[in-house]
Each structure stands twice: as structure tokens, then as C-alpha cells.
From Swiss-Prot:
Other remarks on this protein: Heme 1 (or BL or b562) is low-potential and absorbs at about 562 nm, and heme 2 (or BH or b566) is high-potential and absorbs at about 566 nm.
Binding site for a ubiquinone: 201
Cofactor list: heme b
Membrane topology reported for the UniProt record: Multi-pass membrane protein
Subcellular location field: Mitochondrion inner membrane
Gene Ontology biological process: mitochondrial electron transport, ubiquinol to cytochrome c
Entry function: Component of the ubiquinol-cytochrome c reductase complex (complex III or cytochrome b-c1 complex) that is part of the mitochondrial respiratory chain. The b-c1 complex mediates electron transfer from ubiquinol to cytochrome c. Contributes to the generation of a proton gradient across the mitochondrial membrane that is then used for ATP synthesis.
UniProt protein name: Cytochrome b
Amino acid sequence: MASLRKTHPLIKIANDALVDLPTPSNISAWWNFGSLLGLCLITQILTGLFLAMHYTSDISTAFSSVTHICRDVNYGWLIRNVHANGASFFFICIYMHIARGLYYGSYLYKETWNIGVVLLLLVMMTAFVGYVLPWGQMSFWGATVITNLLSAVPYMGDMLVQWIWGGFSVDNATLTRFFAFHFLLPFVIAAATIIHLLFLHETGSNNPIGLNSDADKVSFHPYFSYKDLLGFVIMLLALTLLALFSPNLLGDPENFTPANPLVTPPHIKPEWYFLFAYAILRSIPNKLGGVLALLFSILVLMVVPLLHTSKQRGLTFRPITQFLFWTLVADMIILTWIGGMPVEHPFIIIGQIASVLYFALFLIFMPLAGWLENKALKWAC
């Protein structure tokens, strides 16, 4: 008689995704980040749920309620620190996951990749509205600056901004709706994640050499379930260390001051994981141009599959494109640094060069390198 996990309608779904899933035997630790993102999402939903039990989304009490959570709620300080730093780990994992996809050509699974880009946008949106909730100075001014960007939309920009604000400035209505969105979006992300996995399991996983692995597959459990478990332990250890030893390392000191619409902080900047996009936004002097550049800095990922010119899938055997990939990584680091710097010489020009290079690598250099490597292969033969 067949076992229950193979016959029960519900358990069968979990079995096909987590136990009997045929997995390429040679996938490396770079394939761990998908499951780590799942762990991050679950951690964020659970800690967020407990925070929501004590938080009040009213401008007169929001800041005090966060203080109350940290001082009076049992382990409230821990829940808040894990939630705040968990967001950073979420983005570390998501950027590593995307980098893996770019390096090994996983983007050729177009549906999976495009839903992944939508997931990235949803996570960014969730993190942005979440950052506003403590109602500190950087929360308030960050919300003001970023929502104000929508005023660059032709004809309906100002109306759009006021509609999002729920008034003529970032106020109580804004905070209330941002809390509602911040509560709702993680569940939308969870649903999109299931669709992401559904499309992935239609094709099966890619692997480091980019070749068809049908001839060499192993079951997901126990081989990769234990490998994922090791990843969980390492990430949870790192998150715990950060949350317990230096919980405010990645935050902005400005956010310890309650929001004051009459005092502008000297440097308004988002959390570290948005700095690269913020640098691209600031590198264009025109408001609408900057907003479009900001949007395309993420949406450019959607055109990557269309610009794949190489006969090989990954970069494992493609040294020229490898060099360009690591140039992109260095460029992202430079953009992140520039995003946190004041708008003055020499940071302006460095940011502009880095922004041009960012788009050039995706749209020009990488497709060209793929074409060149095809030619080199022909000559070598």
C-alpha cells in the first residue's frame, strides 16, 4: 500500500515540494537562499504579528507604543530587534538569491524569474511602509521624500501624492494606511512565493554547470533538507548575534527622535538595503528622470532573459562575463556607499558614473560579452 504522504491530497503537495522533489545532485550552497528567504518571511510574519499586538498606528502614540514594546512587554525588545534586523537579513538573502540567478543563468526560467522580480518589488514596498511605523524623524521624512516622488507623474502627480497621504501632508491618515499595508503585504508575498515555487517545480532547479540534470537527480529529503537546515542554523545564529549585540548597527540614530514636521534632518536617507536605488535616483538632476531611473533599476532585471546572447547558460565557463558580473557587484557596493553620502563633490560624479555603469552592464556589456564568447568558442573549435 502506498504511503499516506503520496496519496493524501494535501500532504501529497507538501511531499512533492519538500520530500520526493527530484533535485540536481550538484547544486551548491548558493541554492540555499531560496529556503532562507522562506525562513526570513516566516520569522518576519511571526515577530510582526506579536509587535502588531502592542503597536498603535496613531501619530500621537506610535513612537510611545514602540518605546512601550521595548520597555514593558515581555521580550518586546527582542521581538522588535529581531524584526528590524530580520528585514536586513531578508534583503541580504534576496540580493544573494538574485546574484545566484544572474550568475548561473536561472533567469532563463522566465515565469519563475519575473514572479521573483515582482516579489522583490513587494518586499521593497513592505519594508518601506514598515520603516515609517515607528514614527521617528527618519521614518517621517523618509515617507515624505519618497511619496513626494510620485508628484513627478505628469498631469496627476500632485493628486496621486495627496491620495496616498490622505491629506495635504504625511499625517495620521498616512500612518494608519501604511500600517494596514504593512500588515497585509507579507501575506501577498507568501501567496506570490507559492506561485514562484509552482513555476519553479514545473521546470526543476537549474545547477552550477547549466546543463540538463535529468540523468543525475537525488530526492530533496534527506540530502537538501539537511543542507537547508544547516543554512537555517547559520543564518539564525548571525541574526541572533546582530539582534543581541548590536541591534542598532544598521539603523539611523535620527529615528530615536520622535517625528517633527518642523525640523528636517541634515541627511535624509533610507535603510542600507535601498541605498543603491536611492543613489541612482539622486544621480539624475531631473525629478521625473530620477523616478524612472529608480523604477528601472529594479525592472531592468525583467529584460535580462531577453538579452541573453550566450550559447552557455551560466557564467561557470565564461571568464569575460564573469569579470562583468563582479564589476556589477562592485558597482552595487559603490552605489550603496554613495547613497549614504551627502550630495556634494566628488560623490555626485561618482554616483552618476556608477549609475551609468549599472545600466550599461545589464543592457550593453553583458549581451556583448555573451556574443563575443560565442565567437571565441567558434574560433577555438
